[in-house]
Amino acid sequence: MAPKAAEKKPVEKTPAVKKPKAEKKVPTSKEGGEKKGKKKSKKSMETYKIYIFKVLKQVHPDIGISSKAMSITNSFINDIFEKLAGESAKLARYNKKPTITSREIQTSVRLVLPGELAKHAVSEGTKAVTKFTSA
């Protein structure tokens, strides 16, 4: 016998449920989603420019300095401080100490700076530390 044709029932239509579209993400950084009344603050770059200028005026009150020379001097000071900090950190690590003290700084000055310059730097540094501790 031939199989009976399956009775076809009308399919009930259910309302199609639409998925909500992905919403646009609002940027959370300061660039796009700033609050009203607040301005984006500029990150301040710390320099030694005012101190360089003060020392220049102490030594030579009648002489000025160009912005390019100031920038070069500032870079020089940053480089020297970076070398001294690195050397001091090495010394502290060698001696298995967790803290960089004035002794490590003094030793690193003697190692990094040449001859007479190191002697003057050590004496000025000692004088500054003495003045700081007594005040």
From Swiss-Prot:
<dbReference type="GO" id="GO:0003677">
    <property type="term" value="F:DNA binding"/>
</dbReference>
<dbReference type="GO" id="GO:0030527">
    <property type="term" value="F:structural constituent of chromatin"/>
</dbReference>
<dbReference type="GO" id="GO:0046982">
    <property type="term" value="F:protein heterodimerization activity"/>
</dbReference>
<keyword id="KW-0238">DNA-binding</keyword>
<protein>
    <recommendedName>
        <fullName>Histone H2B.4</fullName>
    </recommendedName>
</protein>
<feature type="compositionally biased region" description="Basic and acidic residues">
    <location>
        <begin position="1"/>
        <end position="12"/>
    </location>
</feature>
<dbReference type="GO" id="GO:0005634">
    <property type="term" value="C:nucleus"/>
</dbReference>
<feature type="compositionally biased region" description="Basic and acidic residues">
    <location>
        <begin position="23"/>
        <end position="35"/>
    </location>
</feature>
<feature type="modified residue" description="N6-acetyllysine">
    <location>
        <position position="8"/>
    </location>
</feature>
<dbReference type="InterPro" id="IPR055333">
    <property type="entry name" value="HISTONE_H2B_site"/>
</dbReference>
<keyword id="KW-1017">Isopeptide bond</keyword>
<keyword id="KW-0158">Chromosome</keyword>
<comment type="similarity">
    <text>Belongs to the histone H2B family.</text>
</comment>
<comment type="function">
    <text>Core component of nucleosome. Nucleosomes wrap and compact DNA into chromatin, limiting DNA accessibility to the cellular machineries which require DNA as a template. Histones thereby play a central role in transcription regulation, DNA repair, DNA replication and chromosomal stability. DNA accessibility is regulated via a complex set of post-translational modifications of histones, also called histone code, and nucleosome remodeling.</text>
</comment>
<keyword id="KW-0832">Ubl conjugation</keyword>
<keyword id="KW-0539">Nucleus</keyword>
<keyword id="KW-0544">Nucleosome core</keyword>
<feature type="region of interest" description="Disordered">
    <location>
        <begin position="1"/>
        <end position="43"/>
    </location>
</feature>
<dbReference type="InterPro" id="IPR009072">
    <property type="entry name" value="Histone-fold"/>
</dbReference>
<keyword id="KW-0007">Acetylation</keyword>
<dbReference type="InterPro" id="IPR007125">
    <property type="entry name" value="Histone_H2A/H2B/H3"/>
</dbReference>
<comment type="subunit">
    <text>The nucleosome is a histone octamer containing two molecules each of H2A, H2B, H3 and H4 assembled in one H3-H4 heterotetramer and two H2A-H2B heterodimers. The octamer wraps approximately 147 bp of DNA.</text>
</comment>
<feature type="modified residue" description="N6-acetyllysine">
    <location>
        <position position="24"/>
    </location>
</feature>
<feature type="cross-link" description="Glycyl lysine isopeptide (Lys-Gly) (interchain with G-Cter in ubiquitin)">
    <location>
        <position position="131"/>
    </location>
</feature>
<dbReference type="InterPro" id="IPR000558">
    <property type="entry name" value="Histone_H2B"/>
</dbReference>
<dbReference type="GO" id="GO:0000786">
    <property type="term" value="C:nucleosome"/>
</dbReference>
<dbReference type="Pfam" id="PF00125">
    <property type="entry name" value="Histone"/>
</dbReference>
